Amino acid sequence: MISLKSIVDKLYNLEDLSYQESYQLFDYFIKGQIELPLQTSILTALKLKKETSIEIASAVEALLDNTKEFPKIKGDLAGIVGTGGDGFNTINISTTAAIVAATAGYKVAKHGGRSVSSKSGSFDLLESFGVNIELAPDQTKQCLELYNLGFLFAPFYSEGFRYIREARAILKTRTIFNILGPLINPARPNKVVIGVYSKDLILPMAKTLVNLGIDRAAVVYGSGLDEVAIHDGTYVAEIQNSQITEYKVSPADFGIDTYAIKDLEGGLPEQNREIIKQILLGKGKEAHNAAVAVNVAMLMKLYDKDDLKQNTQEVLEIIKSGKCFNTLQQVINYSNK
């Protein structure tokens, strides 16, 4: 076993960790074996040094090895998630996109937690709607099979996350756990759209996904946002057959108008709930609908639907039908049986 002191000394010298060192470090983290002051120092050192794809992949393996097992789902399983920490406090686009994608016929396993750095995290929103976020894994699997949608609450699957919550809150900034969050979904989706909070993270995240053996993925950075943008260009690293292809898309590539970031501003969970409810009922603002649609359109590309404009139009029609709220309502009802 590698000593914690030797790992910390390397980080204080801004040296990269080996696979084994990073695995051991995050095993210590998730088992509550690192005291709070040292946790904050380690997370700060990692951030200043900049995390490598090897450090991220080994941390993912350590965290998944300490997570409750989720029953395997037959066929393709999608994930739409952002790292958070982009600082813009937009409405919950990835959560809404997951509900819309499920309505469109894609099985989506949404993994996440309550807010750390924004006003309203994905599971704050879901709780405000009345979703029981602590379903047993077999019940969540059945919900996925019935309604194409399952919510996996991170602290329920990995109780060790309680050991790191305080350090993350104290730091009030994004840390490696923002990067790890999208990668440690216990349902292990094979088709994922992951939004990152920095352009510098696109390639390390993509390389990490290749190292983890993910089938198809798109890592996106939307000019400041951790999702596909409607205010400016979006940088993409797409993964297929372990190959990474980088490109940039604009709102016009999706066939939509360009909007301002302020058009997507969120608020407290109650305010966000009302905004999201209107979108799901087919009564949302054009900017809100567009933001959700382009993210689902990018997911559809991972299913060999390459025409982003056509994908976006299909999704907008589904949104405007109001059927998406029915999907959420079915999940709410099922989760409270």
Curated annotation (Swiss-Prot):
GO-annotated cellular components: cytosol
Binding site for anthranilate 1: G82
Short name of any one Pfam family annotated for the protein: Glycos_transf_3
Cofactor details (free text): Binds 2 magnesium ions per monomer.
Keywords (A to Z) from UniProt: Amino-acid biosynthesis, Aromatic amino acid biosynthesis, Glycosyltransferase, Magnesium, Metal-binding, Transferase, Tryptophan biosynthesis
Record pathway: Amino-acid biosynthesis; L-tryptophan biosynthesis; L-tryptophan from chorismate: step 2/5
Entry keyword Glycosyltransferase: yes
Annotated anthranilate 2 binding sites: R168
Amino acids binding Mg(2+) 1: S94, E227
UniProt-recorded Gene Ontology molecular function terms: anthranilate phosphoribosyltransferase activity; magnesium ion binding
Binding-site positions, 5-phospho-alpha-D-ribose 1-diphosphate: 82, 85-86, 90, 92-95, 110-118, 122
Reaction equation(s) it catalyzes: N-(5-phospho-beta-D-ribosyl)anthranilate + diphosphate = 5-phospho-alpha-D-ribose 1-diphosphate + anthranilate
SUPFAM superfamilies noted in UniProt: Nucleoside phosphorylase/phosphoribosyltransferase catalytic domain, Nucleoside phosphorylase/phosphoribosyltransferase N-terminal domain
Any one GO biological process: L-tryptophan biosynthetic process
Domain of life: Bacteria
Top-level class of the enzyme under EC nomenclature: transferase
Binding site for Mg(2+) 2: D226, E227
EC number(s) from the headed UniProt entry: 2.4.2.18
Cofactor(s) this protein cannot do without: Mg(2+)
Family from the record: Belongs to the anthranilate phosphoribosyltransferase family.
Subunit structure of this chain's protein: Homodimer.
Function, in words: Catalyzes the transfer of the phosphoribosyl group of 5-phosphorylribose-1-pyrophosphate (PRPP) to anthranilate to yield N-(5'-phosphoribosyl)-anthranilate (PRA).
Descriptive protein name: Anthranilate phosphoribosyltransferase
Organism for this UniProt entry: Francisella tularensis subsp. novicida (strain U112)
